[in-house]
């Protein structure tokens, strides 16, 4: 199935971190709020797969590879990101529902990245506020723009005429 999605430039999201659906690759610069898929660096991908956060897929990270991670871009190069026990602030604005957790759903300690940073050129900070237990840049830091692809939900590109629009003629 993954080979078919690569040929068609599709990505299927079944994770609660983003709206469920079928997404396709779009030629767009990585903008704040854009949904992207990314291959995590090998060691981080292996960590995520070993813990069951990600399944098998096309990215490097152990036998059988690791699936791509889908998230929204929260901060771009030059943005100031502050992560504390209370949550994430981007350029001084508190992001609702962004408090990092100490443990995952199985009680295992999560990596902790606290402090203030400025996102460097060529990087983005990924964050999901759709799901409280999302594994994102709060735990592993920014990711390289060169490792991500911007995607868009297929249904966002489909216009469906209401069923009543063709009646009465």
What does each model-identified segment do?
Residues 1-68, 117-118, 138-169:
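Protein maturation boundaries and topogenic segments
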Residues 63-97:
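Mid-length scaffold segments of soluble, non-membrane domains
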Residues 38, 49-52, 94-103:
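Glycine-rich, pocket-lining loop/helix-strand segments that form or immediately flank
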Residues 58-60, 101-108:
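Short, flexible loop segments at the rims of nucleotide/cofactor-binding pockets, characterized by
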Residues 34-36, 79, 123:
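Structural motif
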């Amino acid at each position: 199935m993954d080979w078919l999605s690569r040929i068609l430039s599709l990505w299927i999201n079944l994770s609660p971190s983003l709206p469920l659906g079928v997404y396709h690759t779009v030629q767009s610069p990585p903008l704040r709020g854009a949904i992207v898929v990314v291959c995590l660096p090998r060691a981080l991908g292996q960590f995520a797969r070993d813990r069951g956060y990600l399944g098998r897929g096309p990215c490097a990270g152990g036998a059988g590879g690791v699936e791509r991670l889908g998230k929204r871009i929260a901060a771009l190069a030059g943005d100031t990101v502050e992560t504390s026990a209370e949550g994430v602030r981007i350029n001084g604005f508190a992001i609702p529902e962004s408090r990092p957790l100490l443990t995952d759903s199985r009680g295992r300690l999560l990596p902790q990245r606290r402090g203030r940073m400025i996102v460097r050129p060529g990087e983005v900070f990924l964050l999901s506020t759709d799901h409280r237990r999302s594994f994102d840049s709060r735990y592993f830091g920014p990711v390289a723009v060169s490792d991500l692809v911007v995607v868009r939900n297929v249904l966002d590109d489909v216009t469906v005429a209401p069923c009543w629009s063709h009646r009465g003629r």
